């Protein structure tokens, strides 16, 4: 009886030996384990067996998702009851750091774990990125002409051999080397690139400013271009007129082209770099005006097209950081006057506000910082309050000292900027418009500027070693000496109302003469050490010279109109080193007929052929003492030729002067300059004549 009662008691299910007579109670009191959720046996009651099935399926699906995320194959459904194999957390965590015994590193660019062999270590820094990301990075940089390559994570420069190893692309490497070469040649002022299409040949034209006709020596090219304007060669034409002609033809071609639309971008969006001349396109998207050339690395302002520093937009230059055009002259002058007048009031107001703000604001700021420092820490309230009180008390003592030092240093700096930097910056080069008239006091010019910088203006502003920087625009008569070599500009143009512009030795002169008018021009050129700037030319019937700025330009062939009683006198004084020009006295000059005809149909000559010639034939003659109405014209023009090298030059100079004068040349109607009948006094000199080379040449016509 006792054994039966014990077996029927509710505590019998806890015993180690199960009782077959008590199946029901033993089933109800059984323990629930994690293994039983997946492998539960169906009992006689189906309702109880179906309760744990959905929960088991959900847990099984979650486990499969985790396994797929960790890149592990799914485990089979029948999992053993061993707890060491039931939890796969430990083997999966170790697989993230190694794969087959190899160390995995995370790329900072694509955030993908890869073997260490795929992440090369760059020289100079400890950063590592995968090869795929590095190749894409270098490909983008080289395609956009950025050759100053650096590490993607720091500013450490990459060596060319590292770039070659990472790229492993001969075409990109060739382009990279070409961009490096262009960047290097951009610093050479005498480097000229061939303008022919599909030609990347460069010419180092050192000392060719006096003979600007250059020829590309690349095999199959042979293009001729100008040293000054860097465009196709334009014989008997100035650089400005050739540029205008090209612009006109391009505009005409664009208007008739079917692909031309009126919605194309403005020319103001494309400007050349002020250092290397590479064209740069600026998107009209509201970006800043601080530009950086990708070819030469020049930093310049898009509005004024000048190389700038970081303080350019803080100075009163009229250029704004975000604007589309610079300030007008009126706005700059008004801003200057307002600054000069209102500076004391503004500085006093700023100092009056800054002193109490610092005296009150510094203690408040210190107290808040100390309170936030102790807020998250487990410290006593007494210690925190003591630190806050001490910091505020110390800041109250030091705040007046800081305010006094700031005002004592800041106010003189602002006064020096307002009354020193602002006037100097605005009045530099006449930008302030303030001028002093004769007996009229100070005059302020409020005329507006010409407008924004265009492509043509930007090209004219390029720094070039050419001797000619003068413009041929306008019809004002006078002598322009804007070239660095102080050259001569002579223009015996039409003797009527229409001026003629011809450039010689670096300048431009528009001669406008009327009835009984007289023109006298005298120019001087000092000898320089540079061979290209030691030569002067006074016109020749050859097309072997650019007439832009023109040391070594030509005078175009023309016929003087028949004007009654008009005399023209030109005096030329050139001081230079001895050249191959040889002049004799007036008795040695014979009147050949060849000198009377203009040099038409001559073959163009390059620099070498130009230097080999000693005297160029004159295109026309103006006989001294003969009136133009009688149709007798004779001229004697001398042209010192280019000197080959500094070794062939002599430091001695001669004082010989060849003069062709007449006592009657000053009269409106000269009959003759000599007692004998007038004769032509100009002939082509023989290059073989061993005559003395003069230094000073004075010509009277």
UniProtKB/Swiss-Prot annotation:
CDD domains: Rcat_RBR_RNF19, RING-HC_RBR_RNF19B. The keyword Glycosyltransferase does not apply. It is an enzyme of class 2 (transferase). Residues 1-304 are annotated as: Required for ubiquitin ligase activity and for protection against staurosporin-induced cell death. One of its GO terms (molecular function) is ubiquitin protein ligase activity. The chain crosses the membrane at residues 340-360, 396-416. The first IBR-type zinc finger is the most crucial for interaction with UBE2L3, UBE2L6 and UCKL1. This is E3 ubiquitin-protein ligase RNF19B. It comes from Danio rerio. The gene is rnf19b.
